[in-house]
Amino acid sequence: VGDYGDLKLLLTDAAEKSHADFMLINPIHATAPVEPLEPSPYLPESRRFMNVTYIRPQDIEEYAGLDEAALAEVERLHAEVAPANDNADELDINSAWWHKRQALQLVFKVPRSAERQAAFEAFKEAAGPDLRAFAAWSVAFQMWGAPWEGTWFAETNRDSPEVAELMRDHADMVEFECWLQWIADEQVTAAQTAARESGMALGLMQDMAVGVHSLGADVWWNPERFAVGSVTVGCPPDFYNQQGQDWGQPPFNPNYLAKTGYGVYREMVHNMFSHAGAVRIDHVLGLFRLWWIPQGEGARGGAYVTYDYEAMIAILTIEASRVNGLVVGEDLGTVPDYVRTVLAEHGLLGCTVEWFARVDDSPNAGDPYADPADYREYALASVTTHDLPPTAGYLQFEHVKLREELNLLTGPVEEFQASATAERQAMLDRLVESELITPEIAADVDDHIQEIVEAMHKMLLRSPSVLLQAALVDGVGETRSQNQPGTSSEYSNWRVPLAGPDLKVVHTDASVRPAAREVAFRHHERRKSKRPHITP
């Protein structure tokens, strides 16, 4: 399991060896304080605070102050979980976090210098009452059990005497949860600082999830902010997810947002830009409208509810301009044309993915792919997304095999196999036409997978898009899906270790393929002349 120290090293390595200008990461919003952890970074407990499971204990200043017994215990805890880092099977995130949390509690007990304590106090003051609210939920989770296993979530709230008593009786635990947030903030800030000092134009690109867990800290402490209990958020059916998706998240209450001047949204965006040079908005359509799904209806039974996109885009552009940053809106799938027009008018980038980019936006699998030279300029262009298998896997129909295995297909497997075959052939035709592969390679895909993956990345370089992205999974030749939309426990979503085609875990950059590095380098060369202008 990686940590913020690994992130820092990845950023500086990408900057120094590939001249990369940014690195897009999954959301690092807050998760549960103890196991069981929610594997999906897109279903956080709070979007205001950070995921502390990625803290690197050794990088905390007070780590050096551990006494001999405490240091020995920390090293023992680390030794117990270290072998898992060489295993390409499913990551045991619960065990990894349990061991790390014990180590962090020991570091927390080390006395801080006056300067460090002052910095901690300043952090708490700047974070405001929401920090103690999140800490209270975290302590309640530990003392009263997971909220889905008991009644405390429904029977208590921020004004309950039981909650006040809990915070008094367990003030040390509340302080520990606040401290974890401070340490996470420090380490992500250090990663972003290192990225910029290494020459990255943007550094970290953080990802903003659509919403939060229905039983998480944000909903418990401030239920009035959400449409709680009767609806969840998702998306309607499309070609890639025939059943639609229900993300299980309560939507923001648009009336509350308007009445309170979008304060909660402002705080969230401001916090993300304090550690990043760019922010990607997952499902940017959510700024305009969200697919509300009535309880028990399934994704097909939903309907769109509109939001004041002008207010939220204004907040995004103002906060981005404070750090000379960028905003990327994930506008894939079912998105009205006016959404892309509005984004471009304000200098917000959209997303273009080679696997989705067809001539005239045709939905038919066998229709020709667009020439990347015709892609939008104001966009982040990539070969694939985290909702598809890595490109090597996609070329070998891993998406069809996995969906059949998980009973996610809505018709005969032969029908979907034929569609995937037509889709692949259309991509091969585009690559042959672009003179990036030969007809002989196109006729013998299985023996030339990596050559085709390289060709697809080289084709991306012909795009005029201001940001170009290569996925790390493609860089090392991984084939397994990191995430299968529409599933939860059925698949090991977000727990698949990074491995090469031989399923050996990747620890160094030695396996990163030249085309992935070239995408980063070519993007660096063009960035100064193509920087979009953010318009608040």
Summary of predicted features, one role per range:
Residues 116-119, 331-479:
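Conserved alpha/beta catalytic core and glycan-binding cleft of carbohydrate-active enzymes
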Residues 474-508:
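Low-complexity, glycine/alanine/valine/leucine- and proline-rich hydrophobic stretches
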Residues 13-19, 187-202, 271-278, 315-326, ...:
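A structural motif corresponding to the C-terminal end of an alpha-helix
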Residues 132, 201-264, 268-271, 275, ...:
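Substrate-binding/active-site clefts of carbohydrate-active enzymes
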Residues 21-25, 202-206, 279, 327-329, ...:
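Hydrophobic faces of well-ordered beta-strands that scaffold small-molecule active sites
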Residues 28-33, 142-144, 209-213, 285-288, ...:
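Short, solvent-exposed loop/turn segments at secondary-structure junctions
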Residues 40-42, 50, 66, 192-196, ...:
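Active-site-proximal helices and loops of the catalytic beta/alpha 8
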Residues 1-222:
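Acidic/aromatic-lined carbohydrate-recognition and catalytic surfaces
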